[in-house]
Amino acid sequence: RDFCLSRGLGDVYKRQDMGLVYLDTGAMYRIVTLKALNEGILGNDGLNELDKIKKLLDDLNIDIRENGFYLDDADVSEEIRKPIVSENVSDVAAIREVREKMVDLQRKFSESKNVILDGRDIGTVVFPNADLKIFLVADARERAKRRYRELIEKGENVEIEEIYENILKRDKIDSTRKESPLKKAKDAVEVDTTSKSIEEVKNEILRMINSNI
């Protein structure tokens, strides 16, 4: 169950009824990033106090509910998608202690459930023995357009070039980091969504899931 890249899989999941529980693992790293921003642990130059990040993890209160993500009992589902979080999440996600904590939570969440996990290291680190691994890819420009439309619909004031540059930066950081780098699992099926509609991608994924049930 290895899924990757900006937007697409969440939309695919919302348009199906397979009886599977969906978890966007990237949102969990965004929650840690949001909390670090709120507590002033992240500055203009990025991460600056590793010890405080570790303390933050000890006190972290994440609640994954059917209607969204909660931090300290507050719904942060929209807030974690803001550009300031996107700009900093890859730096936070590269920290070993953060990844270890999130992977542990992801595995606990998946106990006794049939799940779809959406993330950048699911098939290589979190669940290397998953029943099905799908590696979604798309051209960076297309991903920037998708994210731009999504943020504009939410009333955000954003520039598409900034989104594009942020995507390139995140991809570089995520694919070269020491801890759980972004890469395709050897047994993953790659699906290029660049020129495909959500409906087309959904149907393709459904066919693969049904053939593995």
Residue ranges and their predicted role:
Residues 121-126, 134-145, 154-179, 199-200, ...:
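Anionic, Ser/Thr-rich low-complexity intrinsically disordered regions
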Residues 77-154:
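ATP-dependent NMP and nucleoside kinases share a basic, alpha-helical "lid"
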Residues 71-77, 86, 148-154, 173-213:
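NTP-dependent small-molecule kinase module
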Residues 1-13:
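Single conserved hydrophobic/aromatic residue that forms the stacking wall/gate
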Residues 9, 128-132, 186-188:
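Short glycine-/polar-rich loops that comprise or flank the Walker A/P-loop
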Residues 26, 73, 102, 116, ...:
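Residue-level signal for inorganic ion chemistry
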Residues 22, 133-135, 188-191:
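Conserved beta-strand scaffold positions in the cores of enzyme catalytic domains, especially
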Residues 17-82:
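N-terminal phosphate/diphosphate-binding loop that engages ATP/GTP or pyrophosphate donors
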